[in-house]
Design a protein with these regions (language model features):
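Short alpha-helix-to-loop micro-motif enriched in aromatics/charged/Gly
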Residues: 61-68
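Cyclic-nucleotide recognition modules
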Residues: 69-125
């Protein structure tokens, strides 16, 4: 499938705008673990995911990561083109969680179309509002929800995404997603194991009591 099949508002663009986007959209393939954009890069461009999975995260002064959101097929990343938004200074890192194919559109190209199209401008604002809502929700979870509940919710989300109850994931990776230390994750996972909710092995977490994790997450 080509670019036009993935861009959500393609049919609302003028033929000229469609030609500009198609001509300037560069298809790029990256391996799992590749850092596509980080806060020190001036402007990577707008990203449109064709297949795979991307993770957006921030780094603390101590180098600790915390995931903000993830991007899947047909999702668009604007923060990698933050130079389009003069009032937003957001040092964010975008990393491939899986082998990913995506289109990269230069900020200049997209900004040109956004300035002449109210449809594109409104669409962009909707994406921005959604991302900020996700970040605000995450901050509320970190501030007000206990870690055991957050971890239960994370494990259930991973099971849903990977479509399996046996997660191939390390404690270090979980810690990076959740913005905490590996030791904290390990202690809580061992508690979950003692309670019969999970089974731990090297590099894997098996969900044994999905219902109990859901109840814990919901309380």
């Amino acid at each position: 499938m080509d670019f036009s099949s993935y861009f959500p508002i393609w049919n609302k663009l003028t033929p000229t705008q469609q030609q500009i986007l198609e001509r300037n959209a560069v298809l790029r393939k990256v391996d799992k673990g590749t850092v596509i954009h980080n806060g020190t890069v001036e402007c990577t461009g707008l990203l449109l995911v064709r297949s795979g999975q991307l993770r957006a995260y921030i780094l603390s002064d101590e180098g600790r990561e915390i995931s903000l959101y993830r991007l899947f097929d047909r999702d668009i990343c604007l923060f990698s083109a933050s130079c389009m938004m003069n009032s937003i200074q957001f040092e964010i890192t975008i990393e491939a969680q899986k082998d990913t194919t995506m289109w990269v559109i230069s900020a200049d190209t997209y900004q040109h179309i956004m300035k002449e199209s109210a449809v594109v401008a409104n669409f962009t604002n909707e994406i921005m509002a959604t991302r900020f809502s996700e970040v605000m929700w995450l901050m509320e979870q970190i501030m007000w929800k206990s870690f055991d509940k957050r971890l239960a919710e994370f494990l259930l989300e991973e099971c849903s995404l990977e479509e399996t109850n046996i997660l191939k994931i390390t404690h270090e990776t979980i810690a990076s997603h959740m913005g905490t230390a590996r030791e904290v994750v390990t202690r809580m996972l061992r508690y979950f194991q003692n309670e019969g909710m999970v089974k731990l092995a090297r590099g894997t977490v098996e969900i044994c009591e999905e219902r109990r994790l859901q109840e814990l997450s919901d309380t």
